[in-house]
Every structure is written in structure tokens, then in C-alpha cells.
Amino acid sequence: MDTSSKENIQLFCKTSVQPVGRPSFKTEYPSSEEKQPCCGELKVFLCALSFVYFAKALAEGYLKSTITQIERRFDIPSSLVGVIDGSFEIGNLLVITFVSYFGAKLHRPKIIGAGCVIMGVGTLLIAMPQFFMEQYKYERYSPSSNSTLSISPCLLESSSQLPVSVMEKSKSKISNECEVDTSSSMWIYVFLGNLLRGIGETPIQPLGIAYLDDFASEDNAAFYIGCVQTVAIIGPIFGFLLGSLCAKLYVDIGFVNLDHITITPKDPQWVGAWWLGYLIAGIISLLAAVPFWYLPKSLPRSQSREDSNSSSEKSKFIIDDHTDYQTPQGENAKIMEMARDFLPSLKNLFGNPVYFLYLCTSTVQFNSLFGMVTYKPKYIEQQYGQSSSRANFVIGLINIPAVALGIFSGGIVMKKFRISVCGAAKLYLGSSVFGYLLFLSLFALGCENSDVAGLTVSYQGTKPVSYHERALFSDCNSRCKCSETKWEPMCGENGITYVSACLAGCQTSNRSGKNIIFYNCTCVGIAASKSGNSSGIVGRCQKDNGCPQMFLYFLVISVITSYTLSLGGIPGYILLLRCIKPQLKSFALGIYTLAIRVLAGIPAPVYFGVLIDTSCLKWGFKRCGSRGSCRLYDSNVFRHIYLGLTVILGTVSILLSIAVLFILKKNYVSKHRSFITKRERTMVSTRFQKENYTTSDHLLQPNYWPGKETQL
């Protein structure tokens, strides 16, 4: 064979043979120089997004840790605190639909950066009331600045040195104090600041997660999302720890002489420096915005995601309505042109049964989550007699790390075992069921009510009493002119707490430094006392001896439950991402976030708070006579309301999760069979084509070149 023929053969062999009308599957891989910027920028975005998640989670965790502090500082009920907490979701609701839909078609990193700035400003606004309100005034018994002087608490109204109840004040004095008390409405700034936080946080999840999922490889997407979600859990750890630290500092630190403060962090009237953490969180949020202004609008897609639209597994669950969802290109894209596909996109999402059912499941589950997390510090304080600082410390250092570990473990499991969509749904359901069963055991790990004379036990300390305001008075204090609206708890030698030293019938008192001791208390004397004394000290008595052990058991079960439930977080999120069209991903995440905010984030803290308020035994009163925050809860009723609501919502969530798995299996089996049939036909066709290609290659070999066989 001549040289020209050999060159033609070599050239032909180097060229892939393609059938007529079939596109080439040859892909030109970018060089290492081309790959590096893409991977580098994606990792920069991953780090920036993780830091933003940390910042927003820090502020959110800190807000949860200051719920009790805000309630006491502004003297408002739990239901109103729930409204303040829900204002974050209201802010999300205002813009989530537009941000998730239009933001996906614009410069996503810059939109996230702008959101961080708004979020930081809102966080700083929350702290502003501290600098405009008058100093915090708590109800206190002040015998005298002279430590050697003894005054009878029983003759409270006759002493000009002591504060009296608003019920005994003259109308003119009440009117004057009401004018000063207008600062209590400053909680509206906390509401507005949290509202701004919600608006600023809106683009972070739908645009950030979709950006990662778009440009990361399919194998790494779950791992990257798991990393982001894990960092997001680390944020609340620092948030609750910061809350624990600030709760130990007096609210007006730097503004008053702390030597004059007679209460301690264990006192139910104590308010910590709740505002300090918001200043720190606000600055961190502003710093988190910086990297996003320098990131590109888009990145080169990963090689494994080039054909993601035709993924065989994903196609089993996505309903194709043959609508062409085109994204306008260029900076001059018109708003009306982008809005044209809004309703068809929305119809496509809600027409997807897997997406719709999972949306319902998550909404119910997040109702229980939002309500439980919002009032968990209060539950620990009231149920186990712990201080606010200790409750926040325990949640931040023990409970939340278990959640972070569970989320990270879920991402690792998804990556390592390459779990399918059905497998992800099973893992999600399994973790929910197991966590639900563990949670049921918390009903048995409660503490009994503290013995409070006239509220939970009689003045003789022998039998429980039903709550009635007049039950605070008894024969032992009938000659004392006491206020029934005050809350100045005194712990008697008999282990019973009295609403005030006056209601305990105490005749004399002594003050030594910050300690106040009451003597000759007639009501203490009629109840059994271990020492036989009829004295008492300022503050509530500790819970019974078995309560610390119950608290330890509660922590252990709570940690295991948190880990188990969070293990299904990433599988559930991957299920959400894989059951929708790629071009609708940001929009679907936005609608998902919208539903969670509207149907869970806003109402859950409110109705949890309203129902928790029904367990209040002793309300505080403001200077104008209106009802303030709750001073004492019925521990048993509180426990059954708090845990019962969570269990009811968890039951509904599990039933919906079973429905999701049923739909997935039904679609998987039917479409998988159809896919196999098509695959068999394709394999037969491919085998025939390969035989022809092999014959063609054989005919082109130098040792076989018969001139008469011209057909290929």
C-alpha cells in the first residue's frame, strides 16, 4: 500500500465514526489552566456562603436565647414574644417569591451581598431600644440603706421607704408613671429589626444553594450542601453561647453601679445584657457581605452536570409539561419577559406530587421545630429550675453540636453510598420515626411544680390548690396589708416559696450587703420546717432533689433525638432538589422557603406562646396596671402543652412522609420498567450499530481491502 493510502487510513481511524444524523458525544475537556479558576471561584463562593449561613444562624440562635430576656425587659407575654420572633418570617414573606424567581435570572452573588447588608442593619436596629429606654426597674424589697435597721414587711403600706403596688397608688401617681412607662412600647423596634433581618436573609438560601448545585458536580453537590448546612448549625452554637455570656451581664451594665443591684442571674426578675449580642451579630453580617460583590454571575458547569437535564433517575419523578422555560440572556432582560413564565412555573411545581407532598411534610415538621426551639430555653428554666444563662449554655454546647453532627453525617452517607432519591426518602422517614419515638420519653422526664404558697400548695404545705388570685391570702397573713400583684419571691426555711415576704407574714427583716433575711414569718411557722425556724431569704426555693437528675436524663435524650432527626436533613433536601426541573430549582426553593415561613415560621411561635401562656399561675403587672409577663408557670401543664404540640405535629409529619415515599416508589417502579424496556430496545439497536461499525473498522484495516465490497 502506498504512503498516501496509509496516511488516509490513519486519519480515518483517528476520526470517530458517527452514524448519520446522530450528534457527536465527544467532549472537549478544559485544560488545567481553564479548570482552576472555576474550581477556585466555586470554593470561594462555598466559603462565602458558609460564612453568611454562620452569620445569619448566629443572629437567629442569639434571638432564641434572648426570648426570655426580651419578655422580661419589655414586660410582655409569651404570645407577643412569639409575634416578635415571627416577624423574621414576615420579612421573608414580603419578598421571597420575587427574589427567588427574578433573582435566579440576575446576578445572584450580588443579590446575596445586598441581602447581607440589610440583614446586618436589621440586627443592629434590634439593639437600639437599649440606648433610648430608661433603666430597668425590677420589683424589689429594700428595707433600708442602713444594714442595721429592721423593718416589718407585714406593714408594707405604712412604710414610706418601700415601693407599693400599683393597685394601692393614687390615680395621679399612676398617671405620672404611665407617661414614663411609654418606653415599654420600644419592643416595636425589635419587631422592625427582626423584620429587616428576614428581608435580608431571603436570597441566601434559594439563590445560594441553587448556585452551588448548578456549578458543582453531582457527586459533590450533596457534600457541599452538607458543609454549608453544618456551618449553619455551628452559628447557633456560638449564638446560644453568646446568649449565655450576655445573660450573666446585667442589662444596664456600663450605665449603672452594679454594686446597687440586689438580684442575681438566678432571680426570675433578672434581665441580662440582651442587646450586646445583637451589636456583635450585626457587624458580622455586614462583613459577610463583602466577598459576594467580587464573585461572577455564573461559573462553567461541571462536566458531570452538562447532561443533568436528562438524568435518568431524575426523569422518573419530574413531570414534563413540555413548556419551554427560557431564561432571558444579557443585562437588558425585561422584567415582563421574565414574568411571563411565572404562572406556568408555579403550576408545574404544584403539579408535581412529590414536591407538593414533601412541601406539606416539611411545613408541618418545621411547625414543631420552630415552636420547640423558640421556647426551649424557657422550658428548661421553668421545668428544671435552671437559670437563663445555664439554659442557653446547655443548648449551645450540647444540643446544637448534635444537630450539626447529624446534618454532616447525612451528607457523608449520601455521598459515600450514592443513595438514590428513593433511598433518601427512606432515610428521611426512618430518622423522623426513630426521633419521634425517642421524643415521647421526654414526657416522663419532668419535674413537679415548685411549692408556692397559695398557688401550687396551701399555706400549710399539705395539699395542692387550684389557682385563684384570692388564694394568696390566708389567716396567717390576714392582718398584713399586702399587695396581691407584686412578685417578690421569698424562700422559707420550710422549703416553700412565698409570693412576697409580706404574704409570708414576716415581722422583721435584716439586710447585710445584698442579702436580705426575714424573721418571725407567721406563715412559715405554720408549715412543717426542718429547722423549726420561721425565717426566709429573698428568692425562690430550689426544685426538689430529683430534678437535677431528671435534667441530666433530659439532656441525654434530647441530644440523641436531635442527632437522629437531623440525620435526615440532607437526604430530605436532596429529595427536594432532585424532584424538580433544573431550570425551576431556584424558584422551587423560594416557594419552599415561602411556605415554611408563612405556614410555620410565623404562626408556630405565636400559637405555641398563646398556649404556653395558659399555663401561667402568676402574672406580673406593669406600672399602669396592665398585665405584663408571666412570673410563674404550672410545670406540669407547661410540659404537656410544649411536648404535646410537638408530638401531634410530628405524627402528622410522619404520615405525610409515608405518602411521599409511596408516591416515589409508585413512580419509580412504573417508570423504571418503562425505562428498562426502552433501554433494551436501545441496546439491541446499539448492538446492531456496533456490529456495523466493527465491520466498517475491519474493512478499513490494511490487510483487508477488497475493492468489490464498497458498502459500509
From Swiss-Prot:
Residues 1-43, 104-109, 214-232, 297-348, 415-418, 578-586, 665-712 are cytoplasmic. It is a multi-pass membrane protein. Gene3D superfamilies: MFS general substrate transporter like domains. It is found in: Cell membrane. InterPro entries: Kazal_dom, Kazal_dom_sf, MFS_dom, MFS_trans_sf, OATP. One of its GO terms (biological process) is monoatomic ion transport. Disulfide bonds join 476-506, 482-502, 491-523. GO terms for cellular component: basolateral plasma membrane; plasma membrane. GO terms for molecular function: bile acid transmembrane transporter activity; organic anion transmembrane transporter activity; sodium-independent organic anion transmembrane transporter activity; thyroid hormone transmembrane transporter activity. Glycans are attached at residues 146, 510, 520, 533. Residues 470-525 form the Kazal-like domain. Keywords: Cell membrane, Disulfide bond, Glycoprotein, Ion transport, Lipid transport, Membrane, Transmembrane, Transmembrane helix, Transport. Residues 64-82, 135-184, 254-271, 371-390, 443-554, 613-646 are extracellular. The keyword Repeat does not apply. Highly expressed in brain and in Leydig cells in testis. Localized in nests of Leydig cells (at protein level). Expressed in choroid plexus (at protein level). Not strongly enriched in cerebral microvessels. It catalyses: 3,3',5'-triiodo-L-thyronine(out) = 3,3',5'-triiodo-L-thyronine(in); L-thyroxine(out) = L-thyroxine(in); L-thyroxine sulfate(out) = L-thyroxine sulfate(in). The chain crosses the membrane at residues 44-63, 83-103, 110-134, 185-213, 233-253, 272-296, 349-370, 391-414, 419-442, 555-577, 587-612, 647-664. Belongs to the organo anion transporter (TC 2.A.60) family. PANTHER family: ORGANIC ANION TRANSPORTER, SOLUTE CARRIER ORGANIC ANION TRANSPORTER FAMILY MEMBER 1C1. Mediates the Na(+)-independent high affinity transport of organic anions such as the thyroid hormones L-thyroxine (T4), L-thyroxine sulfate (T4S), and 3,3',5'-triiodo-L-thyronine (reverse T3, rT3) at the plasma membrane. Regulates T4 levels in different brain regions by transporting T4, and also by serving as an export pump for T4S, which is a source of T4 after hydrolysis by local sulfatases. Increases the access of these substrates to the intracellular sites where they are metabolized by the deiodinases. This is Solute carrier organic anion transporter family member 1C1. It comes from Homo sapiens. The gene is SLCO1C1.
